[in-house]
């Protein structure tokens, strides 16, 4: 991409540098194998060294760090060490805000927020959480994740939509609530025995989810596609009867900060059901452009799925309104414009000092 330079920093033996690779993110990597904890100091030091080197060798107008920890912390610490007076913008995507709840980590997050010229979060619910931590509301902007809703995630009338397929897309991790969806399936199948569930995604819970499908005697009704390239997702959304995203709050308090796949599905005019977490309120207006089901409750989820399967007219209305609503709010052109405004505001404030 023109104007974009990617600098990769080494932090371990190359064949072991998998801490931030696919598989559910760093937190889930740590859960999958405790040996990954040994890499964290090297990861932090490698990133710190790379950022300090850049700050000392080049001139920047702004630093934009994604995630409060570790990237926000590394950026703030690098500025402190180099004594560079460069404004810092931090974006929280949810996992860093809702997880990492120890007192020391909470203090660290507040320190990063205090060192930031501005903060962006991906949902209104997250802004409330940040403000509750003592951050000035004027310092926080809600800018959701963007989606290519005009080129990639679009409807295609030539693709025949099925009448017997539920679709889930996402990482196979606790916060996605797939166990709830699997537990809801027997009730759905009791009324719609020909229904199938397609799961597009990979992650550390795959084996456990396959075992659960076996225990529920629905193995022959569930298709695990594994990791699916992004350019293959639109046709999955276009063919599915409806998409289901049963997001939950985990025992440790982790929850979805936004739910990008919900926007992707709606962009393809696929009717959507999602768990009723606070972050979903920015995307789904229940009964208007999608349906919300009580989070963490398999029977309630099954009833919501059946309600939508029973009503083709409702599915068509939600699909149309869903597409219309997300294009107005989440297309990349809209999101890029919002970030440009924040960048200009921060840089101009720095110039006035």
What are these regions (language model features)?
Residues 125, 146:
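Carbohydrate-associated surface elements
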Residues 159-186, 198, 243:
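Conserved donor-binding/catalytic core segment of Leloir-type glycosyltransferases
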Residues 194, 300, 307, 314-329, ...:
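A short, well-ordered alpha-helix in the C-terminal region of glycosyltransferases
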Residues 207-231:
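Nucleotide-activated donor-binding/catalytic signature segment of Leloir-type glycosyltransferases, i.e.
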Residues 227-228, 235-240:
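Short alpha-helical donor nucleotide-sugar binding micro-motif in glycosyltransferases
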Residues 238-253, 270:
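Acidic donor-binding loop of glycosyltransferase active sites
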Residues 262, 267, 271-274, 284:
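Short hydrophobic beta-strand element within catalytic cores of glycosyltransferases
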Residues 286-287, 291-298, 307-313:
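Conserved acidic donor-binding segment of nucleotide-sugar-dependent glycosyltransferases
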């Amino acid at each position: 991409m023109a104007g974009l330079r990617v600098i990769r920093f080494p932090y371990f033996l190359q064949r072991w540098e998998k801490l931030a690779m696919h598989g559910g993110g760093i937190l889930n990597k740590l859960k999958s194998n405790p040996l990954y904890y040994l890499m964290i100091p090297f990861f932090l030091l490698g990133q710190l060294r790379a950022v300090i080197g850049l700050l000392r060798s080049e001139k920047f107008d702004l630093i934009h760090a994604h995630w409060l920890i570790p990237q926000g912390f590394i950026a703030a610490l690098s500025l402190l060490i180099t004594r560079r007076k460069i404004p810092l913008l931090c974006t929280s995507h949810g996992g860093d805000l809702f997880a990492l709840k120890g007192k020391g980590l909470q203090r660290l997050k507040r320190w990063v927020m205090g060192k930031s010229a501005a903060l962006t979060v991906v949902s209104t619910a997250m802004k409330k959480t940040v403000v509750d931590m003592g951050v000035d509301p004027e310092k926080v902007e809600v800018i959701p994740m963007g989606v290519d809703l005009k080129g990639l995630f679009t409807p295609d009338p030539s693709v025949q939509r099925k009448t017997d397929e539920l679709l889930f897309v996402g990482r196979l991790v606790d916060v996605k609530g797939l166990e709830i969806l699997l537990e809801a399936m027997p009730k759905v199948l009791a009324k719609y025995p020909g229904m199938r569930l397609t799961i597009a995604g990979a992650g550390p819970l795959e084996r456990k989810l396959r075992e659960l499908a076996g225990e529920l005697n629905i193995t022959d009704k569930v298709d695990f596609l594994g990791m699916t390239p992004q350019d293959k997702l639109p046709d999955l959304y276009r063919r599915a009867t409806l998409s289901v995203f049963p997001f939950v709050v985990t025992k440790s308090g982790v929850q979805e900060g936004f739910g990008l796949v919900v926007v992707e599905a709606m962009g393809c005019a696929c009717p959507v059901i999602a768990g009723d977490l606070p972050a979903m309120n920015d995307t789904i207006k229940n009964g208007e452009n999608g349906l919300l089901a009580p989070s963490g409750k398999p029977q309630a989820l099954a009833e919501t799925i059946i309600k939508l399967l029973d009503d083709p007219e409702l599915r068509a209305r939600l699909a149309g309104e869903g597409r219309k609503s997300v294009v107005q709010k989440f297309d990349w052109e809209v999101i890029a414009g919002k970030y440009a405004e924040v960048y200009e505001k921060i840089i101009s404030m720095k110039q006035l000092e």
